[in-house]
Amino acid sequence: MNYQAMKLLNVFKIIAFSFIILISVKCSKYHGESEQYTVDGPGNGAQVVPANSSTGTAVLAGDYNSSNNTLSCILNWSGLSGPPTAIHIHGPAAVGRNNIYQFVLVKVPAVASGVMSFESVFTEAQEGSLISNAFYYDIHTAANPNGEIRGQIILH
């Protein structure tokens, strides 16, 4: 093999090796990295659809880990008309829209003002809607069985 052919072969090897490295890096980006999001969601009766006159409020804070699709939050509420009868996470639904619940929170403290922590694992199909802020929580009471407090879950 002459000198020019060997040079060309070496250049080809370098290009091929670089291409393999580039593909490996690109693939690992899409299959191994996760994103961590902070989550918040103030809630009140005005966000319930249809709205109600509750003076109760709620604050949701936490994070979402896309590698294991886990939403981990603390929910504080105060001033409800009575203790919660249920707390749900609904979606997908934009602000001002309703949808069926996807998660039922358990071990809810039976107090008109309280705090609880929870984790919910989302499916891959649900994750896109969650990241698009299309999930909400609501707190139900005996006086407001369709929901006394609602808050959109917002990821940052």
Report each predicted region and the residues it spans.
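Metal-centered catalytic cores of metalloenzymes
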Residues: I23-I87, G91-H156
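Bacterial Sec-dependent N-terminal signal peptides
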Residues: M1-Q36
